[in-house]
Amino acid sequence: MKNRLEQLSWIKSASVQRKLPNKFYVRVSERVPIAIYQSNYKLHLLDIDGKILENDGIGNFDNLPIIVGKGAEKSARHFLYVLGKFPKIQNQLVFAVFVGERRWNMRINRGITVKLPEKNLGYAMQILDEIADENGFFHSDIQEIDLRILDRVIVKKRVDAQR
């Protein structure tokens, strides 16, 4: 019974105890989804360990961030942990793409793409958080913010805004 329960994608662990003469005690630890993972044009729920869960009722989790890209399920835990330290950025996130199985791009509100570095993700998020406050980037005519080089912020304006 324990093994059958643990084969269900939503069950992290299970224990079953028999209490004679006629009782069983079942304890189940459930997996908790942390993101919606898009793979091969299908949406899946993803837990903190990178395990893909059965997606019955995925609409009940539309508040979760969407992540895309090969290997994203393995790196989502760290990315979402760092992102969670910056609620202003987290609230602007539309989806995140894992690029080349090594770094992240974010699409935030108003269609802005933020290119993040492979390393020092927290530092890059801190810079984004600071410049967003100072310059109102989240409400401007910015198309792209490139933070891949740590000592530079490269900003690209929308083509229609440059005229």
Language model features by range: what are they?
Residues 2-163:
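Charged, solvent-exposed interaction patches on well-folded alpha/beta domains
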